[in-house]
Amino acid sequence: MRAERLRLSEEQGQRILRLYHLYRLTIGLVLVLLISSELEDQVLKLVHPELFHVGSWCYLVFNILVALFLPPSRQLLPIFILALTDVLMLCGLFYAGGGVPSGIGSLLVVAVAIANILLRGRIGLVIAAAASLGLLYLTFFLSLSSPDATNHYVQAGGLGTLCFAAALVIQALVRRQEQTETLAEERAETVANLEELNALILQRMRTGILVVDSRQAILLANQAALGLLRQDDVQGASLGRHSPMLMHCMKQWRLNPSLRPPTLKVVPDGPTVQPSFISLNREDDQHVLIFLEDISQIAQQAQQMKLAGLGRLTAGIAHEIRNPLGAISHAAQLLQESEELDAPDRRLTQIIQDQSKRMNLVIENVLQLSRRRQAEPQQLDLKEWLQRFVDEYPGRLRNDSQLHLQLGAGDIQTRMDPHQLNQVLSNLVQNGLRYSAQAHGRGQVWLSLARDPESDLPVLEVIDDGPGVPADKLNNLFEPFFTTESKGTGLGLYLSRELCESNQARIDYRNREEGGGCFRITFAHPRKLS
């Protein structure tokens, strides 16, 4: 019995035990008040008044001491001893009170029932057996001294039967309650596990998910949606506060649910998304489930297919142009070697050669664009990669040009094809050094790596102190064949943008207030699938 414990939970067991103490204290107090009042002779027909008085006081004092000094325990032995003592003391009061007419037998039935909530199986039935035997034996002893007690055997037997019935019924009810609670706990655990799994799946989804109530307050947002909204936490906030365009789109959908929502940008500088709405009817409140599908990857795949077809066409055209262009350049070179040419004619042949070289460079860039291989993104530690890039770059620096590196705090990683990143960065650095040298005679470029404070995405800025780009030409900066130099091909920045997009990165340009230009590359999240 020492090794056995209560099957109830600790909280339930302690609560029932406290109620048991309170019940016994109440009974003891009522008995003491009854024997101390004038109602004793009217209510009780005591056979042994002095024994009943002493027993009532002992019962009250015993229960007070138990309530004050018995430590809470889940061991069965202390509870068994307490219940058995309680039954024996009530049996003594039953005898002193004159047996069945005293009404103490009913208190025994209640005591047995409460004890069997805490004690289960044969241990609980021992308490019922003790009470039943006590009732029968004490009724027998009373019949020896009081002839009227001989008529109480049936009632005493009935009370004993009630003790066993109460024990068995209570144990069955408690057992069923335990099974119900166990099943409820198992189901609650299953539901909790499913909720955790659903939350994990929801957070790992690349599709942004928002749940909005009828007041347009955001109830739930997964990590992808937070990234699209450029926020850390939007729960409880108004949808219109963070994305007025999405709010307007949802209102239009409420008016006409069959309308296909147009693509939009959730935030001004964010990617283009395709929203879709599903109504979640919840009685009087109507919730809306919003899916935000980033279509930049779909557009990127379509762009790659378009470029693949265009690349094959341009490669054929470039190849056809290259042969006659080579003949023109060769003829101009032979003509320039003639001794009969005067100075103006030599100048013309030089122009032919210079423009032929420029045209050949355009053809080379077009062929390079058409032969561009599929991106193979890798997990990159940008700090380590940039440090290696800067260490290896001095061999390509001219005169006293300088390349500076500024690294932000913490671990900064992304997924990108390292060869294509090298190609993009080399092009941007060369442009920056060239324009910086034109403005100051010495080229300087700064590479600054950090995390965007809003999106937490890795950001690399290529900064120069050159003249910058005229405001009226900013919109055309990344278009093919757009150039601000007579010797440029206009394909470098276009190719850089295409390489960034094929790696799910974004490149932007802005003029700095203090002068110069800044190309900003926003990389993809390191856990984003390619």
UniProtKB/Swiss-Prot annotation:
- Pfam families, per this entry? 6TM_PilS (PF25323), HATPase_c (PF02518), HisKA (PF00512)
Q: Name one GO molecular function term.
A: ATP binding
Q: Which GO biological process annotations does it have?
A: regulation of cell projection assembly
Per the record, the major location class is: membrane
- Knockout-associated phenotype: Deletion mutant results in changes in swimming, swarming and/or twitching motility associated with virulence in specific hosts.
State its role.
Member of the two-component regulatory system PilS/PilR that regulates the expression of multiple genes including the type IV pilus (T4P) major subunit PilA. Thereby, plays a major role in the regulation of multiple motility pathways. Functions as a membrane-associated protein kinase that phosphorylates PilR in response to environmental signals leading to activation of specific gene promoters including the pilin gene.
State the protein's name: Sensor protein kinase PilS
